[in-house]
């Protein structure tokens, strides 16, 4: 097996595997990801086959991963900074990710995490601004986990700004999108707390009733 063919095989398998993972997560396939992966594979294949360049397949795989996953890697870095309470730096990293020509899915994931960081920074209005505009695309493009997370954070932002009707609507959508999940449990807890805050306790089911279902 020639080095150039190994490069081609590694690149092709990389794209196919990641596309398969997107299908398993019920996300829409990213054409940009495929174009970038196959384009880089074609360039490296040509360089090895006709340019006399020697590249180990493992090094090529690492390079391919870093380039095609650049936005998601930055999002993970931003998430780490956010967990450490360094929200300003986390938001700067998310903004950088959005300027690196992300594909649609990666862009939406960056926006979801940016909205969460604003919420943790006690800036719910900014969370609403970021997530409300992106919500429809998130529901269509990404899997139920991301869509539920978006609705939950949006609901919490509405609750903190006193827009309780909007908050309750978002919490209800979480259960519709991703039932029996951690987000659904959090949303139900937040929904009950919101009803109690607004004095609508008659809509909160009793524990005995809840246990029957």
Spell out what each predicted region is.
Residues 76, 113, 146, 152-153, ...:
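"A position-specific structural signal for the A-helix of alpha-solenoid helical repeats
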Residues 68, 105-107, 144-145, 185:
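Residue signature of alpha-solenoid helical repeat architecture, marking inter-repeat boundaries
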Residues 43-77, 81-83:
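Transmembrane alpha-helices and immediately adjacent membrane-cytoplasm interface residues
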Residues 95-99, 132-139, 173-177:
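Amphipathic alpha-helical segments of tetratricopeptide repeats
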């Amino acid at each position: 097996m020639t080095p150039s063919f190994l490069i081609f095989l590694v690149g092709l398998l990389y794209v196919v595997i990641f596309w398969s993972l997107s299908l398993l997560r019920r996300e829409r396939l990213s054409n940009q990801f495929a174009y970038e992966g196959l384009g880089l594979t074609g360039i490296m294949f040509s360089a090895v086959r006709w340019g006399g360049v020697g590249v180990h397949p493992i090094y090529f795989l690492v390079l391919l991963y870093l380039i095609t996953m650049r936005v998601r890697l930055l999002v993970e870095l931003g998430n780490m900074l956010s967990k450490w309470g360094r929200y300003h730096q986390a938001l700067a990293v998310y903004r950088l990710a959005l300027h690196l020509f992300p594909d649609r899915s990666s862009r939406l994931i960056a926006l979801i995490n940016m909205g969460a960081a604003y919420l943790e920074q006690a800036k719910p209005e900014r969370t609403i601004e970021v997530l409300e505009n992106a919500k429809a695309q998130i529901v269509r493009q990404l899997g139920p986990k991301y869509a539920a997370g978006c609705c939950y954070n949006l609901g919490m932002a509405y609750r903190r700004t006193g827009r309780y009707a909007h908050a309750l609507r978002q919490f209800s959508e979480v259960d519709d999108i991703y039932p029996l999940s951690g987000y659904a449990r959090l949303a139900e807890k937040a929904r009950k707390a919101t009803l109690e805050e607004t004095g609508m306790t008659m809509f909160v089911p009793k524990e005995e009733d809840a246990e029957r279902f």
